[in-house]
A protein has these predicted regions:
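Bacterial N-terminal signal peptides
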Residues: 12-22
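Bacterial N-terminal signal peptides that target proteins for export
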Residues: 2-12
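Extracytoplasmic
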Residues: 25-227
Length: 227
């Protein structure tokens, strides 16, 4: 099946980017990744509208489901092996999450994320992608339940970077994180743009990020016209 898509984008205000994509509602031909699932999370493809957890990127490994600049998981596979980072409010599933894969994942901890004031406080044990570097990306198979326009709301820490989304391998330009929080572990939650899916169905969402942030999740919320 031939896959075609087209998009347009425009700036709205100072910080938000409108992303408009027309798609045939199918995954790209030949894509070998699979929606994340394990013994705890068995739901499969994450759903839009809803929350896309950054740590639940697809299964498939380096070059298929993600690209990382090195093979070490500097959170679950390195930092969290130290006893002081295995917090009593957590468990081995959380501190060791996807430890054998290259994407750097950790979780929110009492002494790192809750010993100060956040702009928006994350949940305890919230998984996140950290140790980010330029050129890294993760793929997410998403199930778009209803065509239309959605706000993108990010929970993130640190730099006011630009991040890029692609859908079905088609670049959709950049979104601007609106506020530099001052630390990887000072968190903010804010709308960074909107995205329009012209059709429902499975889509491949690729999140491209740059050096200097922690990313927990993206909420995709229907705008009023969709509801």
């Amino acid at each position: 099946m031939k896959h075609t898509s087209r998009f347009r984008c425009a700036w709205v205000g100072a910080t938000a980017l409108v992303l408009v994509l027309a798609s045939n509602g199918a995954l790209p031909p030949g894509y070998q990744g699979k929606p994340f699932r394990d013994s705890v999370y068995g739901a499969g493809a994450q759903v839009i509208p809803g929350r896309i957890e950054c740590a639940y990127y697809d299964l498939g490994g380096e070059g298929v489901a993600y690209h990382d600049t090195d093979a070490t998981n500097h959170g679950s596979g390195e930092l969290n092996l130290k006893p002081q980072h295995q917090r009593p409010h957590s468990n081995s599933y959380v501190w060791g999450f996807r430890s054998e894969e290259g994407v750097d994942i950790s979780y929110t901890k009492d002494f790192a994320d809750f010993n100060h004031t956040n702009f928006v406080a994350p949940a305890t044990n919230q998984l996140y992608i950290g140790w980010t570097d330029n050129g890294e990306w993760c793929n997410y198979t998403v199930n778009v339940k209803k065509a239309g326009t959605y706000k993108i709301v990010a929970l993130y820490g640190n730099a006011a970077n630009r991040i890029t989304f692609s859908i079905n391998h088609q670049p959709v330009s950049e979104c601007q994180l609106p506020l530099a929080t001052g630390s990887m572990h000072i968190w903010n939650k804010a709308q960074i743009g909107t995205i329009t899916f012209s059709e429902a169905g499975l889509q491949l969402l690729t999140f491209h990020y740059n050096k200097g942030n922690n990313f927990a999740y993206f909420d995709f919320e229907p705008v009023a016209a969709n509801k």
